[in-house]
Design a protein with these regions (language model features):
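Bacterial N-terminal signal peptides that target proteins for export
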Residues: 1-9
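Bacterial N-terminal signal peptides
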Residues: 10-18
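N-terminal pre-catalytic segment of deacetylase/amide-hydrolase enzymes
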Residues: 22-82, 245-255, 299, 313-334
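Metal-dependent polysaccharide deacetylase catalytic core of the NodB/CE4 family, i.e.
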Residues: 27-39, 57-60, 70, 78-82, ...
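Acidic, His- and aromatic-enriched active-site or binding-groove loops in soluble protein domains
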Residues: 206-215
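Catalytic cores of secreted or luminal carbohydrate-active enzymes
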Residues: 219-253
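Beta-strand-enriched, solvent-exposed domains that form extended recognition/catalytic surfaces
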Residues: 249-334
């Protein structure tokens, strides 16, 4: 029975990928034209170039509502799509990027750190109201921008999850009071999360949640671990944008790794692409790690010291590159 169930899940994953017919790449920005913070800055000239590249390559440009409809099956995608998102709600999005998006007719979503609204470097409620009237989407990026999983080093999991929920609902309440609208999308602060945070989001009526794991999105990934491509500094170049738009979503049979006592063990049965000719494993703490490929399954193992890592599984079928990133959280890490 277990063998039949496993085969059914593999078949379902493949079928989902075939039916989806398209990938979605979610762009992530923070600040615009702000030389004070180069690590989170994108120049508006670069933003304009990104928009032109997306249109030149004939990608659809979606709202997050379009993405929601696609994830839940009420929207079909006949070609690849891009979604533009901006995190934190810095004032530079209003002062610099807003007019660029408007001039090109490009929708975008701002994930707001609600507790920062009105401070000198951040949007005001008046700016937010104007942007809403002009079709800009807004979503929840927490009240306090806390690194929630990191709290597990000093409190229990239940305490951390209660803290997360309290913060989440405080942001919801304030936004509803100030705008009359309810946010149904969430971006994890710093892109850090554990699965139980996603469960709380679902319980509270959220429909999508976004990480900071790079890579294209496939519907088989689900609604609460949607990857996004940060486009800043060296990653904002034309060559990088063209590269990330060329990559395809990699699909695995199940969660492809376990972490136990600081040892990351990878055993990833790759479903898409169907025939893997070459595969690599990359861990942010270590770089490329030693791996072997056998019957479309890639194996690898390494010791980790840091609290957060990202695991990348990359594969080629001779024509294209397929990849997926995973957040690896080590509660005992540094």
């Amino acid at each position: 029975m277990k063998m039949l169930s496993r085969k059914f899940m593999v078949l379902l994953l493949v079928l989902l990928c075939v039916l989806a017919q398209a990938k979605v790449v979610v762009f992530l920005y923070h600040r615009f034209d702000d030389a004070r913070y180069p690590s989170t800055n994108t120049w508006t000239e670069e933003l304009e170039r990104h928009i032109k590249i997306v249109k030149e390559l004939d990608f659809d440009i979606w709202t997050i509502k379009d993405l929601e409809d696609y994830v839940y099956g009420s929207k079909k995608a006949n070609k690849d799509a891009v979604v533009f998102t901006v995190d934190d709600g810095y004032r530079s999005v209003y002062e610099h990027a807003y007019k660029v998006f408007q001039s090109h007719g490009v929708p975008f979503c701002v994930f707001l750190q609600i507790g920062a609204v009105g401070y000198s470097d951040y949007l005001t409620w008046e700016m937010i109201d104007e942007m809403i009237r002009n079709g800009v989407e807004f979503a929840n990026h927490s009240f306090s921008h806390t690194d929630f999983p990191a709290l597990l080093s000093k409190m229990s999991e239940n305490q951390m999850l209660e803290y997360f929920k309290t913060d989440l609902m405080k942001a919801q309440r304030i936004f509803k009071e100030r705008t009359g609208k309810t946010m149904v999308y969430y971006a994890y602060p710093y892109g850090h999360y554990i699965p139980k945070m996603a469960e709380i989001l679902q319980q509270e009526g959220f429909l999508l949640a976004f990480s900071q794991n790079p890579g294209p999105y496939d519907v088989s990934y689900g609604a609460f671990e949607i990857p996004r491509e940060p486009l800043l500094e060296d990653w904002a170049t034309e060559s990088h944008v063209r590269y990330i738009l060329s990559r395809e979503p990699l699909v695995t049979e199940n969660l492809p790794f376990v972490l136990q006592n600081g040892i990351l063990t990878v055993k990833s049965k790759i479903v898409v692409p169907k025939e893997v000719r070459y595969a690599t494993l990359y861990v942010s703490e270590k770089g490329l790690i030693k791996s072997r490929l056998e019957n479309n399954t890639v194996f690898g193992e390494t010791a980790l010291k840091k609290m957060y890592n990202r695991l990348m599984i990359s594969a080629r079928d001779g024509k294209k590159e397929y990849l997926r990133y995973y957040l690896v959280f080590n509660a005992q890490g540094e």
